[in-house]
Amino acid sequence: MTGAFVLVAGAVVAPVGAGAGVAGGDTEYLVLLEEGADRSQAVAAVKAAGGEVVKENANLGTLTVRAAASGFVGRVSASSAIEGAARSRPIGTVPRAEKPLSVESENGGSGKVAAGKKVVGMDPLDAQLWGLRMVRSDLARRVQPGKKAVKVGVLDSGIDARNPDIAPNFDWKLSRNFAPDIPEIDGVCEFSGCVDPVGWDDSGHGTHVAGTIGAAVNGVGVSGVAPNVTLVEIRGGQDSGYLFLGPVTDALTYAGDVGLDVVNMSFYVDPWLYNCTANPADSPEAQAEQRTIIRAMTRALNYAHRHGVTLVGSLGNNHEDLGKPRTDLSSPDFPAGTAYPRPIDNATCVDLPVEGPHVIGVSALGPSSTKADYSNYGTEQIEVSAPGGWFRDFFGTPQFRTNGNLILSTYPVNTLQANGLVDAAGELTPDGIALGAQKQCPAGVTDYTKCGYYFVLQGTSMASPHATGVAALIVSQYGKGRPGGFGMDPDKVGRILMDTAQSRACPNPPLLTYTNEGRPAEFNALCEGTRNFNGFYGHGIVDAWAAVTRR
């Protein structure tokens, strides 16, 4: 792990005085320089505080520093050249951990899936993709299937580029991994230097997201909302599911530097579900860390936006109104077992990146177009809604609690094998079939590693890529050439996305309860607003057809 990092084009430069490491060092920090501060003064402050600079992001004004955990933040922040510091990535000995994804894998084994009928211009499994039909991608592709010149960044756990639905659209040259494996939390490193190559994904999350955005129409498996756009991996996530500050900000900077058009962000920045400026429940050091995370993410999001990147983010799976947040019981989620109750003040706390500047927030719907029970909502943060899957949709019908209510997309075979859903020979196991795994091979292919594998998940993580795909179609339809490639003002992209969304009124009555679905009163959700804009649907359900045919 020592010395392992990825260069960000034009932004992250070689280590300053990188050596064997700091004695007793066990944490990597992101140090935020004051605007206009003297760099040499900042580096001197880091050294005086006991840290070692290993990487610099000059465009954001950040230093990645390795230092002993005890007292470093307070010491370095005392310098007038430093605005703050926050943990970027753990690099020392910590308990083995994995971020839970219980919402996304809620299905307990119903193999029921509607067979459907193959549609012209679609792929064999697309009949199961009710989300494509809800956002009318099946119609939009007849007018605009997306342009190769439009580049969509997937800031996630990686992308499995071996999948035949991903391979035709994957950009090997531009893709980068900003999150080297951390053995203490990710397990034994499979690759030299603990850096997974681009085109690899142990988690599966990023591959699932990428397929929904832009799986190719190729006669195999599934197709995405924008099946002809280019997919770029800008990995910021660990195999264990965590996304820490340093890799995320580096990935966003890179997205701006290389001219990506849209970036999907289906995550929140660990370890804090909400970052607060001065929460009384937090220690002074924790408060300082969160202020730094807010400032660093704000810089990174603003940087990407200024460079023409449309930013799309998931609202989250905590079933709460983000404008009226409940007590946070899950933070910090790293290291494991350190969370404590934190009352959240909406005026001084934010969920990042979705509550950061320029991010289009997306809520999740089930196939009935009802807000999924798990999905966050709220008029302050939402822009649009999109299909995210809801296992418990259609209560009282045979479709209740079936895999057909979830989102089917591309998935890495290695991840399915690690979870016992595919065997060593590449065949689906009974558990895999029950949980919704599927397999399709191109004609004449007998090597299972060249086949397509697919899996069902639910979450706002699945809703956001539907909106990202529509945004990519908007850039494809209305974008123009610009220095370094093709593109469109992200504010204009956002306006079209929202203006062409299918308006949906709040339910009547507006208080939606999920008692029949087996949820406690905590899940009850009050929809506020008008038909044209409300807390469940925002401006409406994203509509690819309306977006590419507007006049």
Listing of model-derived features with the role each one plays in the protein:
Residues 30-31, 64, 151-155, 211, ...:
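Structural recognition of the beta-strand scaffold that forms the well-ordered cores
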